[in-house]
Amino acid sequence: MRATPLAAPAGSLSRKKRLELDDNLDTERPVQKRARSGPQPRLPPCLLPLSPPTAPDRATAVATASRLGPYVLLEPEEGGRAYQALHCPTGTEYTCKVYPVQEALAVLEPYARLPPHKHVARPTEVLAGTQLLYAFFTRTHGDMHSLVRSRHRIPEPEAAVLFRQMATALAHCHQHGLVLRDLKLCRFVFADRERKKLVLENLEDSCVLTGPDDSLWDKHACPAYVGPEILSSRASYSGKAADVWSLGVALFTMLAGHYPFQDSEPVLLFGKIRRGAYALPAGLSAPARCLVRCLLRREPAERLTATGILLHPWLRQDPMPLAPTRSHLWEAAQVVPDGLGLDEAREEEGDREVVLYG
């Protein structure tokens, strides 16, 4: 006999509350019931359909899924920690992330620190059992990494619109004492099917600062996005400046279709990063080249701040030139520094252009 969907609890969103469950879901993570069959080929994540399953498949999934208050958990998503979820009273789709309840404070602290922002994802509801924590997020429609992988290069006008949203999200985090540490393209996801609006997700691993000092000691970063100061022997580094470097890698990848630093051998890859050895692709406008160089500076103190990025001419909505001011940020935005190691990069890579994942 099918269970009757429970009514959604009244109250504001993004709140934590104790569950009233029909079944004990705290003993283990939800398990999806599957028919026994032979191995099935799996598509890579970028080729999976963005639209929801057809009605018959969804009905079958709901009938066999795990019940969680007014929600049912459906198929697990890539990585195993998140599940597709359906809010029964409204039929709205969500992504449910599951954590041990002991991690509740660490998981929710970054979201509690940040005021709501249109370009930063936050849980719409949090349910807590005795052993597991369930955070529900609005479903998204692909990410920037998949977009670059499928299109190779993003035209400058479109890239500027998307990158402004990315920089806005980072500036919001930095202004409220949050360092992302592991910033990369796949953390920026599309909130709409038209792929026009980006939001930053996965703040759970961010570092919440307790004061103005943003010094970090851990070496937490994706190899392709890691800053040279993290690879050095320095005891600490600026977390915010490291985020800006990673954002510069993301911008370069959007415009070029490949990472600025590439090598199959990690030692050689890290050597290129330490030297700042990259070559800008041909055809970029002068403002775009300027912004990339202002972000991928070997010295952290020479990079633009996240707020300063938004003042750069490449991201200005007004195409008319502005009168120069004495603002430090404006002066920094106007500087077009010579990239360190550019000649080395040209000698090493020549004219070849390696496409992402190709």
Swiss-Prot record:
It comes from Homo sapiens. Transmembrane segments: none annotated. Belongs to the protein kinase superfamily. CAMK Ser/Thr protein kinase family. Tribbles subfamily. The lineage of its organism: Eukaryota, Metazoa, Chordata, Craniata, Vertebrata. SUPFAM superfamilies: Protein kinase-like (PK-like). This is Tribbles homolog 3. InterPro entries: Kinase-like_dom_sf (IPR011009), Prot_kinase_dom (IPR000719), Tribbles/Ser_Thr_kinase_40 (IPR024104). One of its GO terms (molecular function) is mitogen-activated protein kinase kinase binding. Residues 1-54 are annotated as: Disordered. The keyword Nucleus applies. The modification Phosphoserine is found at residue 12. Residues 1-127 are annotated as: Interaction with DDIT3/CHOP. Pfam families: Pkinase. It is found in: Nucleus. The protein kinase domain is predicted to be catalytically inactive. One of its GO terms (cellular component) is cytosol. Its main location: nucleus.
